[in-house]
Regions:
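Interdomain "pre-motor" coupling segment immediately N-terminal to P-loop NTPase/helicase cores
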Residues: 9, 13-67
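N-terminal pre-Walker A segment at the start of P-loop NTPase domains
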Residues: 71-94
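Pre-Walker A (Motif I) flank of P-loop NTPase domains
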Residues: 98-103
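The conserved Walker
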Residues: 109
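Conserved lysine of the Walker
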Residues: 113
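Hydrophobic positions on the alpha1 helix immediately C-terminal to the Walker A/P-loop
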Residues: 116, 120
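Post-Walker A helix-loop "phosphate-sensing" segment adjacent to the P-loop in P-loop NTPases
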Residues: 122-134, 144
């Protein structure tokens, strides 16, 4: 490495444009007739792509997904006609986030609700949106602990900053009045400001089994379903169907 190369790497590091330090690779791949402006453009493209990749990585890590699932891996053939592949493609465009709409997925266990929620969250991350994935029961515990430890406001601000909040499994545990009030506030604060995805195996008529305050249940459903897409995903179990196919 000559002195010029060393200086280029040094300045690239100081200016935080590491892709420019790899200019020799761009030169090797470039058209021999390319001019200086063409080479500069290729370097800028490489730097932009690198930054986008790093940002995507950070967003994925911050989202807190328990595992990664994609839209391409989701088998929508077992869903009812109300949830068409075309509609899923529309959701995957993340226009619902741009429109500040919610998505409510209702279906029996094993219907692929969590898979679909994660896949939509992954799409959102790659499109530049900040996403948070939270199990509903875990979040209610975190909210209570945050309040007891006098940093509830900090957690609420973190949740509010998410362009998309995914509340998974809002059905397996019931919530006491204290937990209900904290969850309600989180959802209420997001209404018409940002998007929320909720997965649950209970129809709205059974949500009174989850929360002590029936009046709050009506208000919660009202907040969630306003400007929302409600997906009825009931039918044969997605996991059961996959298991039977593996045995065949």
């Amino acid at each position: 490495m000559n002195a010029v190369d060393e200086l280029i790497r040094l300045y690239a590091k100081q200016l935080k444009i590491p892709s420019f330090a790899e200019y020799q690779e761009v030169l090797r791949q470039a058209d021999p007739s390319a001019g200086f402006s063409d080479l500069l453009l290729e370097l800028m493209k490489a730097e932009t792509a690198s930054r986008q990749e790093n940002q995507n990585r950070r967003r994925l890590k911050a989202a807190g997904f328990p595992y990664l699932k994609t839209m391409e891996e989701f088998d929508c053939s077992q869903l009812n006609d109300a949830v068409s592949p075309l509609f899923l493609q529309e959701l995957a465009s993340c226009q619902f986030i741009q429109n500040r709409q919610n998505v409510i997925m209702i279906g029996n266990p094993g219907r692929g609700k969590t898979h679909l929620a994660i896949a939509l969250g992954l799409k959102a991350c790659t499109q530049g949106y900040n996403v948070l994935f939270k199990n509903a029961a875990t979040l209610s515990t975190e909210l209570c602990e945050a309040k007891d430890n006098y940093h509830l406001g900090r957690l609420e601000r973190t949740l509010a900053k998410a362009d998309l909040l995914i509340l998974d499994e809002l059905s397996y545990l019931s919530f006491n009045r204290h937990q209900s009030e904290l969850l309600f506030k989180v959802i209420s604060d997001r209404s018409e400001k940002s998007s929320t995805i909720v997965t649950t195996n209970l129809p709205f008529s059974n949500w009174t089994d989850l929360f002590e305050n029936t009046t709050m249940v009506a208000a919660l459903i009202d907040r969630l379903t306003f400007r929302s897409h409600v997906l009825d995903m009931n039918g044969d179990s997605y996991r059961l169907k996959a298991t039977m196919q593996n045995k065949a």
